[in-house]
Amino acid sequence: MDSTPYNIILLAGGTAPTLTDGTGVDEKASLTIHDQPMLQWVVNAFHHSPEAGNIVVVGSDNLDKLRCMQYVRKRITQGLSVVQNLLHAVGYVKARFYKGEPDHQGYIISFGDTVFLTPEIVTDTLRAIREADADIVLHYVERQTFVEAGLPAERTYIPIGGKEYTGTGIYYVRKFSKVFSSLNELVEMRKQRKDPKGILRVIGCEGEDFPAIEAALSARLDAKVRILISPHAGMGMDVDKPADYRLARKILPSPDTDEL
């Protein structure tokens, strides 16, 4: 099994007026928690994981002034859509790090607002992805995981196999050529992560269990799809609305100023 650290793509573009209005920043990724920009929390989590290698960020040149960018190999200017951003980032990683070779390790994709990730969560997750040995790996977190962690469980869940799950902020794709025709569907799954009916409609497996969903997605994408259940509540959390931002400021520790 290849043990080379994964190349990481962080999608950090876009604005969120409900979060940034009155803060003096235009972009969500620059919004601070304990005086540290959200993107810096995310870069820190990946930078300090032995399973993560090169980090590529997609976002505007406003991000260049952030201290964490010294640990980013390349910033790619955001395009007009998530699909375009992904294609630009994947194209860069394939050309720069994989030298255009068809056989490579694939791509880890995350987001500039996944501030609840830690190096430990990233390491466990990327090791699980490595062991899954699949073309596409998705993670979900069960509702009970939030309860046991003492975190608010009032979020949107997807009913699967008699339990309730929510999506996460780390995805793996081995080869985008295999999923290019269905890339819009994958993006739609991310977009619909807060809407159980919406994501089940995209998946097309309402009421089924995870093995059935894996089989359906594998057949649809002509790729080996694995769905893993993460034991980490932080995997199922991001900063998408003001309540998330308040929670982040409440539970995230004040960072060590020398951490990065």
What are the functions of these language-model segments?
Residues 118-219, 230-233:
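Conserved core of the sugar-phosphate nucleotidyltransferase
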Residues 226-229, 238:
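Conserved active-site beta-strand element of glycosyltransferases/polysaccharide synthases
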